[in-house]
Design a protein with these regions (language model features):
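Alpha/beta-hydrolase fold nucleophile elbow
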Residues: 210-222
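Glycine-rich nucleophile elbow surrounding the catalytic serine of serine-hydrolase chemistry
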Residues: 220-230
């Protein structure tokens, strides 16, 4: 009799286990159907979606209500409805390397207990008082010798911004750089959540370092453009947004860090990256686009919709687009030549430190460092004992 009872109890617990497992799988399957990835819309569908959305907001108040809803859905879809408790940053800051008009220090800090964000801090050598702050995330460049924030084009913009008078933090995406070598990967399912949280903590870091809270900008290209407009949408401490070659009515991002969680859609809600980018309105925003990727329609499709939203605030001139029809995807020279004057204007930077009076770019004095030279962990600054070495070890506070 006892054996039969034990068998029945065991069967009951097995049924409960498989029932819970089935429920969790059902939730996962439902979330998957809500994903908007890559070319989720055709170009014509993207334009039609924006045209239809105008009926939802014909006044400033109606747009503000819509923007609030978009922010809520981003945070809900990313699993950040409730922020985890912010741990001390415990920043590890390396020695200064001084160059012509700027200096560089490698940095690591904790975004969550044991989770280290790695990057480099660029500053003008003649810094006085509170400096404007620029966060600059990178895109998905991952070929050996041409990786993320270590690429020459990235180092050039970091250094140029610093020469112009800004505090600049260029930081690694999850699984890139030294953390990738330690065991982290960029392909984990919830990398969007951690990456967005890391960007929030990067803002905390530059503010803790003394950046002017009224002059904070974010700019990056491709996947770095996605990080730019997502952060600007959900964190109002970002005062200026410059997403490069990314904002599109029809393309939602092809990486799990951009669209691998249901931030764009649920059963009763749909948005796209144009509306997400617009959440910063009426603060200044510059789109930089080219003729060879999903931003090719910016002058005819995305910009007019953004102008429509900014006009609701009577500030249509605060959103701009520089379109380069003969350029390709990247943050190359022509893109930087478009961004430098915009950030100089709105952050009060010295444009002469990066551009000549004839409009040509001045970057010949900038030193391109080797990738390993930009790593924060070395013999003098070893990887901390509490440091997490893989995505699956991350603990989110419930």
């Amino acid at each position: 009799m006892m054996k039969i009872y034990q068998l029945l109890v065991a069967c009951f617990f097995l049924l409960c286990f498989f029932s819970l497992e089935a429920q969790e799988q059902k939730k996962l399957d439902a979330a998957q159907t809500m994903l908007c990835q890559g070319n989720y819309f055709t170009e014509s569908e993207g334009k039609a979606f924006l045209d239809g959305q105008k009926n939802l907001y014909t006044t400033q108040k109606e747009w503000e209500k819509r923007a609030k809803l978009i922010r809520q859905h981003i945070l809900k879809g990313a699993g950040l409805e409730k922020f985890p408790k912010k741990c001390p940053l415990n920043a590890i800051i390396g020695e200064k390397r001084v160059y012509d008009g700027y200096q560089v220090q490698n940095v690591a800090f904790e975004s969550l207990p044991g989770v280290y964000v790695t990057g480099s801090l660029y500053m003008p050598t003649s810094a006085k008082g509170r400096l404007p702050g620029i966060l600059s995330p990178h895109g998905h460049w991952s070929k050996k010798g041409d990786v993320g924030r270590y690429r020459p084009d990235a180092q050039k913009r970091f250094a140029a911004f610093a020469r112009m008078g800004a505090m600049v933090f260029g930081y690694d995406m999850v699984g890139y750089g030294q953390m990738g070598e330690l065991g982290w990967t960029h392909s984990a399912p919830e990398v969007l959540k951690l990456q967005l949280w890391n960007s929030i903590r990067c803002l905390d870091f530059i503010l803790e370092m003394g950046a002017d809270p009224e002059k904070i900008a974010c700019t990056g290209a491709s996947g770095g453009g996605t990080q730019t407009f997502l952060l600007a949408a959900i964190d109002q401490r970002v005062k200026i947004s410059v997403p490069v070659v990314m904002v599109s009515a029809h393309f939602f991002g092809g990486c799990v860090c951009e669209s691998g969680m249901p931030i764009h859609k649920d059963l009763n809600f749909q948005t796209n990256n144009v509306e997400i980018a617009a959440c910063i309105a009426p603060r200044p925003m510059l789109l930089v686009s080219d003729g060879d990727d999903w931003t090719k329609n910016n002058p005819e499709v995305e910009l007019p919709h953004l102008k429509y939203i900014y006009q609701l605030f009577n500030k249509p001139d605060l959103v701009q687009n520089v379109h380069l029809p003969n350029d390709k995807h990247g943050y190359d020279l022509n893109k930087r030549a478009a961004v430098y004057p915009f950030l100089a204007k709105y952050l009060g930077l010295d444009l002469s430190k990066a551009m000549n009076t004839d409009g040509t770019v001045r970057e010949d004095m900038i030193v391109i460092e080797e990738q390993q030279a930009l790593y924060p962990f070395d013999n003098q600054h070893p990887f901390p004992a509490n440091g997490i070495r893989s995505n699956d070890q991350v603990k989110w506070e419930k």
